Amino acid sequence: MANILTYIKRNWFELLITFCLFSNLYSYTFPSYIYYIGILLIMYKMTRYQVRFVRKNVIYVFFILAIWLSTIINAVYDIRPILYTLILIVAAPFITGVKWHLYKKKLLHNIFIGFACTVVVSLVAKFQGVNYQVTKRLGESMMLYGCVDEFSGYAKFPMWNSAAAAVSMLYFAYLLFREGEKKRWTRIFYIVMFLASMYVCIISASRSAFGLAVVLSVALLKWLSPNFGKLTKYVVIFGVIGVLSFPFFMDSATRMLQKQEAQEETGVTSRDFLWAQRMAEFHSSPVYGVGFAVQGTDENQTVGRGESGSSWLAILAQTGVIGFVIALILWCKTFTRLRNIRYDSENVLIYALFLFFTVHSILEGYMFQGGWYMCVICWLTVAVVTEAKMYRKYLA
């Protein structure tokens, strides 16, 4: 308990930011302005550090210019481009410094704790029988139609809940596999929390988030356990746990399996309609896009919050080929060999999260939805990976 109180005392500001950001996950419970307070707190913290413009990362400036070019040409009068620009300024690696980089790592460390807390909140909601997907969003249970309800707990959307649980899986895989942790009960706690995160991810019914989390957890085992004996030990442990818990997890995965069966029967995925919309928007304005935060074409065009179905298609539709090519270049520049950032084991975890965002952004709007807390975390992750390479000679 004393260690926990000491940690809170030393990290209270970062924990406050984490709370503000994660309030966005529970939009039925907390007012939306709390999330924006979190962004303002990060901006305030940035002013306390010495930062400079990094010329080698000028591509981010071009990305911002592409967004504003599309916004101005299409006469999109909305505050969202301003919000997104501010997020990139505080999070992306084109205005930064060594100490600001270290602070962003500290903030991400607390954000990972936030993901762990979402799993606990989801378990409490499950125990209490709370599922806002049914009671608040849909208004009725899908069991009335012979289906199984997706679980969101106190969160607004099951997908948001599942993505948070998937990141929590990565976090506890990292804590379990890293060198230096020898206490038996601590390792048992990590295993329990990993399995709890897996359970929440499964009942929230996102196949892609769950599959990616499992693959990257195995990758973390490989990256953090170079010793063959240690690697074998964990394979055996999780093999036994997997065999014993298989019936329980399969029973919990009913909704996930139903979605897979429906896709196989119809040949239609849950993203097809959204992807068709994005492509229609792209075809209507292929060079510079339809404008930031714009959905639809012609008389059906709206400005505001909407489900994009894919970060990359949203960028293509809203900023056209110009913005898409720039985004692709800056994202590819982030990839690195693990040895370039391995001087700090936490960089390995953050790189695993970057890979999660890389793949899952094909299906979700992490990169391009400034009103979603995952957008801030996504760009913080990109920045820390990029800066870890850039400042290696100072920190290794």
Feature roles, as predicted:
Residues 23-35, 76-84, 157-162, 189-221, ...:
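Helix-loop-helix junctions and helix-breaking kinks within/between transmembrane helices
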Residues 46-51, 55-57, 218, 222, ...:
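Hydrophobic transmembrane alpha-helices and their immediate junctions
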Residues 260-319:
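Long extracytoplasmic/lumenal interhelical loops at the membrane interface
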